[in-house]
């Protein structure tokens, strides 16, 4: 049987995600971000709610990406997620993209010339942002030309890099309907961005979300809910360069900007430069909110939920892969668990995220 991997955030889960799961074959394993997202923001609803949505709509097994995998630039995000899915035995990866290309050929190219390609990136001027450097690399070696407004395509290239040298086939699926950043309501498939923006519009949600009741019952958060905490972390920390990935230049800019910024959005605007994209600045602010430090990734894989089919697969992995299904006295990943505790501070109504939580089971889907 085919074992298909999907790397996802489901922030929140919508019809486009359901379409992707419908297109996937065999046993479907999702490696999903926890409570903080790749572009440096809190999930609108918590990881358990999103796991339930995924299982109700076609996923067989959902595992969690650790905090230091999920809140990363595309390449590191893709690499970390692929490492986990590879260990779970996937033989193909399905993903949505704005531009369907021969990603397998791109992966083969990276297998062959990866070292040379990375050297090329290292030698590019530091005035360029990391995405600009990556795009220059793909243009040089693969003749790819694209605008930076296609985040799924950028992630797809990161996945192609991450599967290089592994026995995993890539299956791109044309992204349906609205673009990633689109807030348009008059489309066949709405984007997660639009759903977050129009979260109080009942009719809109019902049109585009398969598990709308789950979404409506859940506590919802936005970055602004954490702004007082973020301000406190910035003001009370004498040396921000002790935080993961924060350099001297960014530390100075953030300390200066917090004097006048009245919101997270304003802070991001003030700190962003040509070289430091908004997504990168948001990630740095997320690291500061967590007081994140460089740390090893957990050896074990945290299971968030499964169907009967998923449970059988987990059983077949026993002894080969270290799995955690209940977080008790032994932490799974201290950094992720700290992030979960801080996530809970966004709204008093958010349920406990770790202790006593067991994987969500769904009999059939």
Curated annotation (Swiss-Prot):
As recorded in UniProt, its EC number(s) are: 6.3.4.-
A GO-annotated cellular component: cytoplasm
Q: What's the superkingdom here?
A: Bacteria
Q: Which residues bind ATP?
A: 7-20, 96, 152, 175
Q: Identify which top EC class this enzyme belongs to.
A: ligase
Q: List the keywords (alphabetical).
A: ATP-binding, Cytoplasm, Ligase, Nucleotide-binding, RNA-binding, tRNA processing, tRNA-binding
Q: Provide the catalytic activity annotation.
A: cytidine(34) in elongator tRNA(Met) + acetate + ATP = N(4)-acetylcytidine(34) in elongator tRNA(Met) + AMP + diphosphate
- Indicate where this protein resides in the cell: Cytoplasm
Q: What is its main location?
A: cytoplasm
For biological process, the GO terms are: tRNA modification
Query: Which Pfam families does this UniProt record tie to the protein?
Result: HIGH_NTase1 (PF05636)
Write one Gene Ontology MF term.
Answer: tRNA binding
Concerning its family, UniProt says: Belongs to the TmcAL family.
The record's PANTHER family line, in alphabetical order, gives: TRNA(MET) CYTIDINE ACETATE LIGASE
Describe the task this protein carries out. Catalyzes the formation of N(4)-acetylcytidine (ac(4)C) at the wobble position of elongator tRNA(Met), using acetate and ATP as substrates. First activates an acetate ion to form acetyladenylate (Ac-AMP) and then transfers the acetyl group to tRNA to form ac(4)C34.
Q: NCBIfam families attached here?
A: PRK13670.1
**Protein name, per record:** tRNA(Met) cytidine acetate ligase
Q: Which organism is it from?
A: Streptococcus pneumoniae serotype 4 (strain ATCC BAA-334 / TIGR4)
């Amino acid at each position: 049987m085919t074992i298909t991997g999907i790397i996802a955030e489901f922030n929140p889960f919508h019809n486009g995600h359901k379409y992707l799961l419908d297109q996937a074959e065999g046993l479907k394993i999702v490696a999903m971000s926890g409570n903080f997202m790749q572009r440096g923001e809190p999930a609108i609803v918590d990881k358990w709610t999103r796991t339930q949505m995924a299982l109700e709509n076609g996923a067989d097994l959902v595992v969690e990406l650790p905090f230091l995998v999920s809140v990363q630039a595309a390449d590191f995000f893709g690499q970390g997620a692929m490492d986990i899915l590879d260990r779970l035995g996937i033989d193909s990866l399905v993903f949505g993209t704005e531009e369907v290309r021969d990603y397998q050929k791109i992966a083969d190219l990276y297998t062959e010339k990866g070292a040379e390609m990375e050297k090329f990136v290292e030698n590019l001027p530091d005035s360029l942002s990391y995405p600009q450097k990556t795009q220059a690399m793909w243009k040089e070696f693969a003749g790819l030309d694209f605008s930076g407004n296609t985040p799924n395509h950028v992630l797809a290239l990161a996945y192609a890099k991450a599967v290089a040298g592994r026995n995993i086939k890539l299956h791109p699926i044309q992204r349906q309907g609205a673009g990633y950043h689109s807030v348009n309501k008059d489309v066949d498939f709405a984007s997660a961005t639009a759903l977050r923006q129009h979260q109080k519009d009942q009719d809109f949600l019902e049109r585009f979300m398969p598990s709308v009741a789950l979404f409506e019952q859940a506590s919802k958060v936005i970055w602004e809910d954490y702004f007082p905490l973020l301000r406190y972390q910035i003001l009370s920390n004498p040396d921000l360069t002790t935080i993961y990935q924060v350099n001297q230049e960014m530390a100075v800019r953030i300390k200066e900007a917090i004097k006048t910024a009245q919101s997270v959005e304003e802070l991001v605007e003030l700190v962003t430069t040509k070289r430091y994209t908004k997504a990168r600045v948001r990630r740095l602010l997320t690291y500061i909110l967590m007081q994140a430090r460089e740390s090893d990734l957990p050896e074990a894989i945290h299971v968030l939920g499964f169907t009967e089919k998923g449970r059988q697969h987990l059983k077949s992995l026993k002894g080969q892969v270290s799995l955690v299904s209940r977080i008790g006295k032994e932490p799974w990943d201290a950094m992720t668990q700290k992030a979960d505790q801080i996530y809970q501070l966004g709204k008093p109504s958010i349920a406990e995220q770790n202790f006593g939580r067991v994987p969500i089971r769904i009999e059939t889907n």
